[in-house]
């Protein structure tokens, strides 16, 4: 079944440039944006706000089904703004408390199913840019416009290192590289929704390509898929 509105999926590992490209595509095309990586953190924060116990699968499932969240493009350097029930929670959801809570709520099958339906509901006119890890393989498999961004582990570690350094964190690049390689191995070899490109996805290795060139390649692919102005 085709989606209700044009959907562009942007999958790939952390540090490949998904967030930046997704934001630029949303701005260029006037499409809405879905940051699926933040969904579980947002749900966890909503549960905390509404005093929902993190082991109450029924209440969490109901909350997930009606999750009032928006993802808004803005200043590229600041990234995507995450708005929960009218409140900017972009910083709050990155807290350790939200991270721990997100791991708990994600363990419930009914919660995951409710969030899957909630993510699909983002597909509304004029269109959607869906940023994630399994958008093209699980959430929106019917869309013809699928992108998969990747980059070498070394390049992604360097990007993450620069980002953390810019934000005042003292980190070691060797440790970041090790963590990235371990996560890649887990993600690519897990039994449920492994991190792999959809068969019909355009795979772009961003290691030695400028953001401008990646954006141009992505827009050309979208134009061919949907015949929308590139």
From Swiss-Prot:
UniProt-listed SUPFAM superfamilies: P-loop containing nucleoside triphosphate hydrolases
Q: Name one GO cellular component term.
A: cytosol
Q: What is its EC number?
A: 2.7.4.25
Positions with a binding annotation for ATP:
12-20
InterPro entries documented for this protein: Cytidylate_kin, Cytidylate_kinase_dom, P-loop_NTPase
Which reaction is this enzyme known to catalyze?
A: CMP + ATP = CDP + ADP; dCMP + ATP = dCDP + ADP
Enzyme class name: transferase
A molecular function (GO) term: ATP binding
Top-level division of the source organism's lineage = Bacteria
Write out the GO biological process terms: nucleobase-containing small molecule interconversion; pyrimidine nucleotide metabolic process
Q: Which Pfam families does the UniProt record give? A: Cytidylate_kin
- The entry's keywords: ATP-binding, Cytoplasm, Kinase, Nucleotide-binding, Transferase
Q: Where in the cell is it found?
A: Cytoplasm
- Chief site of localization: cytoplasm
Give the matching PANTHER family: CYTIDYLATE KINASE (PTHR21299:SF2), CYTIDYLATE KINASE/PANTOATE-BETA-ALANINE LIGASE (PTHR21299)
Q: Which family does it belong to?
A: Belongs to the cytidylate kinase family. Type 1 subfamily.
- The identity of this protein, by name, is Cytidylate kinase
Organism from which the protein derives:
Shewanella piezotolerans (strain WP3 / JCM 13877)
**The encoding gene:** cmk
């Amino acid at each position: 079944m085709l989606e209700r509105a044009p959907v562009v999926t942007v999958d790939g590992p952390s540090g490949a440039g998904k967030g930046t490209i997704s934001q630029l595509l949303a701005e260029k095309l006037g499409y809405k944006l879905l940051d699926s990586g933040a969904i579980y953190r947002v749900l966890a924060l909503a549960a905390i706000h509404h005093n929902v116990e993190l082991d109450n699968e029924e209440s969490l499932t109901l909350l997930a089904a009606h999750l009032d969240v928006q993802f808004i493009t803005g200043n590229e350097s600041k990234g995507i703004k995450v708005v929960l029930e009218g409140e900017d929670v972009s910083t709050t959801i990155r807290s350790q408390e939200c991270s721990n809570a997100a791991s708990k709520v994600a363990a419930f099958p009914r919660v995951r199913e409710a969030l899957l339906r909630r993510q699909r509901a983002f597909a509304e006119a004029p269109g959607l840019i869906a940023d994630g890890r399994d958008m093209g393989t699980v959430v929106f498999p019917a869309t013809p416009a699928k992108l998969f961004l990747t980059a070498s582990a070394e390049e992604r570690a360097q990007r993450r290192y620069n980002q953390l350094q810019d934000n005042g964190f003292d980190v070691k690049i060797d440790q970041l590289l090790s963590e990235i390689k371990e996560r890649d191995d887990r993600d690519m070899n897990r039994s449920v929704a492994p991190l792999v490109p959809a068969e019909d996805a355009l795979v772009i290795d961003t290691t030695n390509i400028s953001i401008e060139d990646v954006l141009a390649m992505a827009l050309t692919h979208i134009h061919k898929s949907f015949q929308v102005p590139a």
